[in-house]
Amino acid sequence: MLFGIVFHANAAEHAGGMNVPSIKSDAVMTGLENPWDMAFLPDGTMFFTEKCKGLSVRTSSGSVNKLYGMKDTKGYNAAGKDLFCDGQAGMLGVVADRDFDKNRTLYVYSTSTKYHGSGCKTNFEKCDGNIVMRFKVSSDLKKVSDRTDIVKDIQYKPFESNQPFGGPGAHNGGRLRIGPGGYLWVAGGDRHRGVCPQDGKLLCGKVL
């Protein structure tokens, strides 16, 4: 469920010297499964991800289009057979390019089997399981195309470990943002391994 939240100060309290805000929420969407991130356009269009389902968009008129799903999902215009979810891993961050109105570019962080190679047999190997995808969004907001995997080797945790909440996919990162300079910033999780933030050759446990 996604909410719109409005803060407003109570007039009587404000008049008495207290400025205590109250909160009003309205359900914008219901029935979602593990919604993870949102990216807004100036007109109110909202791209959003569901961790184990995929990428969708809520248009400024309120209609919803399912754009790009994960393996075995239904109802999406297209799907990536290499994309999967497990624990805290799945389709996570989404952000629109700063010049989206000109280039129609969208970035999405997801977990993928495409670049695993032979490195995912234990939690102590370099398991390249998280990627950043770049898409072009159609002008009618009904489909995405030209998937390009621009980051392919952010490490993923394939097996359970003895840490609290230590299942597969734990500490998976996934946040995407565009900075003031127009650069794309990517957060990779530490996958429950202290070596990740300390080893400069690994992308896990880093802000890229």
Positions of the model-derived regions?
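Bacterial N-terminal signal peptides
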Residues: 1-5
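Acidic, Gly/Ser/Thr-rich repeat motifs that build Ca2+-stabilized beta-propeller blades
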Residues: 11-195
